[in-house]
UniProtKB/Swiss-Prot annotation:
Chief location of this protein within or outside the cell: plastid
Name of the molecule in the record: Large ribosomal subunit protein uL22c
This protein's encoding gene: rpl22
SUPFAM superfamilies: Ribosomal protein L22 (SSF54843)
GO molecular function annotations of the record: rRNA binding; structural constituent of ribosome
């Protein structure tokens, strides 16, 4: 069996909630609203939405931000929800006793939720550095790279 080794990411932090007693469809309805938004905006959205699934997702987003600030020293204002996924978990099966000695099955569905936060300040610093390199006054030795085109150089296309 081939297993992939996870690459260590320097800009992302995640929080994983397993066996949350809610169906995956109901959790996805909430997750789709916050995917791609900033951390603070996602917290405001989750506080104001009227769904029962908002509270465990709110706790997960808050936990992921706490992981980011404690483990990697990121600021909460620079965090963005880059990836949020909901997977179906186990189904807890019970029996409900009914009249005349009968019983009805009850299925409680669970789900696993993963929230990944990324620090966008790293990308902003990288873009600023690229803009600095593109300035005309910048003395960079590798800046005068030329792109050779096979059509204009007449290399292979002259011969038939």
């Amino acid at each position: 069996m081939i297993t992939k080794r996870k690459k260590k990411s320097y800009t992302s932090v995640y929080a994983l909630g397993q066996y949350i007693s809610m169906s995956a469809h109901k959790a996805r309805r909430v997750i789709d609203q916050i995917r791609g938004r900033s951390y603070e905006e996602a917290l405001m959205i989750l506080e104001l939405m009227p769904y029962r699934g908002c509270y465990p997702i709110f706790k997960l987003v808050y936990s992921a931000a706490a992981n980011a600030s404690h483990n990697k020293g990121f600021k909460e204002t620079n965090l963005v929800i880059s990836k949020a996924e909901v997977n179906q978990g186990n189904t807890v099966k019970k029996l409900k006793p009914r009249a005349r000695g009968r019983s009805y099955p009850i299925k409680r569905s669970t789900c696993h939720i993963t929230i990944v936060l990324e620090d966008i300040s790293f990308y902003q610093q990288y873009e600023e550095y690229l803009m600095y390199l593109k300035k005309p006054g910048c003395s960079n030795e590798n800046r005068n790279l030329t792109c050779y085109d096979t059509y204009s150089s007449g290399g292979l296309w002259d011969k038939k």
